[in-house]
Every structure is written in structure tokens, then in C-alpha cells.
Amino acid sequence: MNASVFSAAFLLLSLASSAVYAALSDEVSDPPDVPKLNTQPWVPARYKAVRENLLGKECGILFVGDSITECWEREGAALWKRLFVPMKAVNFGVSGDRTDSMLWRMEDTELAVRTSPRYCILLAGTNNIGLWKGRQPAEQTVKGIREIAVRLLKRFPETRLILMEVTPYGPDPDSPLRRRQEEINRLLRRLELPRTTILSINGSLLKPDGTFREGMFKDHVHLTEKGYLAWADALLPLLNGEG
């Protein structure tokens, strides 16, 4: 291949690579309120477990969410066993789930518990922020969260919903993804839904300057046992009828 042909081929390859990169950078997020299966490789085993734990079971409290909810069974396991198992709590959290994936699981299972829960606790939106690197507008993420909430309230007409504000995304209060998370929470606080309490634990997780309190997080989003204790402390007055 002579130099001119090689240069032309290299130019074409560079242009093609640039086009692919631009397409990935401009990728549009999936509709947050349209059910879609989470296809990440660890999901089938986890979904099988939560499905078996849900269908036909007594349910006093239903936790719906992503890995932060799932990890009640790991970092929060001692608290879960002591505080929530006696309340017949069911963990319907799957790591990596966005709002669309939670909706898919709700449709697939029909949330067919044997007894309707007294409370549903919903924490959603973290992976809508993370997967799309902040490209999904806050209004769209809230649209997905609201759709989950509406379906839960419709499915369980006597149940009360505790809608959690999204927990902090990253230790830097000035980062774009943290600002997106806070924007989502501002919009969540404006929602008007029946039988719903909107609850934030972020004041317990953050210092006054917005950075992480020591010992609350094991990484940029996931809680330690101490973080789960803060969540439990906020939930228990509501679950026990004191709030």
C-alpha cells in the first residue's frame, strides 16, 4: 500500500471512529416509564431469588429498589434480620435496575404477594443517573419514579407508600451527577400522590458542607451498615405509626 492510499484509509477509519464515539456520547436514554428488562449478567440469578421471595408470600413491608435496596441483605443484613424480618418485610431490590427495569419486574410478577403490605418503601433513580452519566433529564427520571409509585398505589389500594429521596451520588457536592441527584429530589418533593410520605435520609448521610459523613458509604453510592442504620432510624417511626 503506497503512502497516499494508506493516508486515505487512515483518514476514513478515523472519521468512522469519531462518528461512533459521537453516537455513544449523544446516546439517548431509554424512556424511564416504559418497562424494560435489565439484561446485565448478574440479574437472572438475583431476579429468580427475589421472585421466589415475593410470589405467594406474606408481606408486611415491601422494599422496591436497586442495589441500595438489595444490600439490606448484605451490609444491612443484621439490621434487616432484627428489625424488618419480624415485620414480614420482602426485599424486591435488584442491583443495576433503573426505573424501567423495576417496572418490568412489577409487571412480570404482578407483585403477587399473598397479603398486601402495610407499607411500600421505594428508592429509585440512582441508576438512571449513573448509567446515562447525567444525560437523562431530572424530569424524565422523576417521571419513571412517579410511574412506579402510581402502579404500587394502584396495586395495593390500602397500602401507604414511603417514597425515598435519591441518596447522594458521589462525595463531591459540586459534581454534575450530585447536582442531578439533588435536582431529582427537588422535583420529587413537589409530587402529589395519595397515601404517600416523601422521606429523605440525606441529612444523616452528609456533613453540612455536602460531603459524606464518615463511615456512611462504602463507595460513591452504596451504604455501609452505619448508613443502613441511618435509614432504619428514619423508617421505624413511620412504620410504627409514630411519624
Regions found by a protein language model. Name each.
Residues 156-163, 195:
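A non-catalytic structural micro-motif
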Residues 168-243:
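Catalytic His-Asp segment of secreted/periplasmic serine-dependent ester chemistry enzymes
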Residues 1-64, 68-81, 115, 242-243:
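N-terminal secretory targeting modules
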Residues 32-38, 91-98, 130-137, 220:
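Acidic/histidine-rich helix-loop elements
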